[in-house]
Amino acid sequence: IMCSKKDEGAFQFTKNLIVILDEYLPEAKARAARTRDAERLTDLLSTNQIPLAIISNNFLVNLQREDSNLFKVLFEHSKTLYTFKDMLLITNHHFPEQHVIAIVESLFKAAKEKHDSVTFVKKANLKINYDEVVFQKLKF
């Protein structure tokens, strides 16, 4: 799971998320990676080199405002799997549906049991659309 060095708080959140995934989805063998900036994150995601990323709400809003072309590329090549209070877990369109389901269900279970930091927070004004599987698996 990658994040950008320029996205404040994303790396610590990613590391915490990996601890939770190691507990609830150990077969994923999740690891953290940091990219130098939004451009590199978008490149790695869109070319399927690293299919998952954590980005903050602020980072995404700033990217849309400061580099609309890069935001458009990210928007076209990604979908949201899970939304937290201040962060989003996104993936590319190549990520297998069974992996989406496993991650969503594991995080939802972790939040219900004891990990408030991964509580799902539905966003109405989402910049990157949810994967349809999210709505099938999580009842709103």
Predicted regions and their residues:
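Extracytoplasmic "Venus flytrap"
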Residues: 1-15
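Solvent-exposed loop/turn segments at secondary-structure junctions
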Residues: 7-9, 58-61, 94-97
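Extracytoplasmic/secreted envelope proteins and their assembly/folding machinery
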Residues: 11-18, 38, 42, 100-104
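Short helix-initiation/N-cap motifs at beta->coil->alpha
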Residues: 26-43, 128
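A ligand-binding cleft/hinge motif common to bilobed small-molecule-binding domains
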Residues: 51-72
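An extracytoplasmic/periplasmic, membrane-proximal ligand-sensing/linker region
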Residues: 113-140
